[in-house]
Amino acid sequence: MSSQVKLTKNAYRLEKVKLSRLETYLPTLKLKKALLQVEVTNAIREASECIQAYEESRESIYAFAELYSVPLYVDAIVNSFKIERVEKEYENVTGVEVPVIKNIVLTESSYSVLDTPIWVDTLVAYSREFVVNKVRSEVAVEKQRILEDELRNVSIRVNLFEKKLIPETTRMIKKIAIFLSDRSITDVGQVKMAKKKIQQRKEESECA
């Protein structure tokens, strides 16, 4: 790309403008990268907590594993509730949209208390907690992934600015400046040479 730039005063001016813009925008990118690093750290912690809650509720379910083989109890759990909707919004965090759960709405249905033991209530409560924690952990992991992807992209851009665009533009400015300086010296030399020849011809003419 840099080899296609013409070594002219106009090209020199354009490269200077380009460098100024790059150097102006780089601090903004670095700030965004720093903010994203903080958000990613928070998202990792949030996802870890949600996953831990999900795994703990899953272990509580496993403690009743044998009971899940009894159709009567399984039917009681299945019929007791279901996820009606997950109220999820997207918030702008350092320029990227991330999901945030506002509410998880469960529809509740009654089951026969007479046909099921009293501890089925506990089993239903554990099942509800398991389902809710599963949804929360999935959204938290999604949020973490989105922020990590954005951080990766911004980091690539920062490296591009620091390692490629700014150095290349700086070198091109220097190259054009040297070329223009050399050409200026050459032009001055040619002017002096032309004047000298004119003077010589004038002197020769006068002598004749």
Curated annotation (Swiss-Prot):
Question: Which molecular function GO terms apply here?
Answer: ATP binding; proton-transporting ATP synthase activity, rotational mechanism; proton-transporting ATPase activity, rotational mechanism
Q: Which domain of life is it from?
A: Bacteria
Q: What processes in GO biological process is this protein linked to? A: proton motive force-driven plasma membrane ATP synthesis
Q: Answer yes or no on keyword Glycoprotein.
A: no
Entry-linked InterPro entries: V_ATPase_D
| Keywords of the record | ATP synthesis, Hydrogen ion transport, Ion transport, Transport
Q: What is this protein called?
A: V-type ATP synthase subunit D
Source species: Chlamydia abortus (strain DSM 27085 / S26/3)
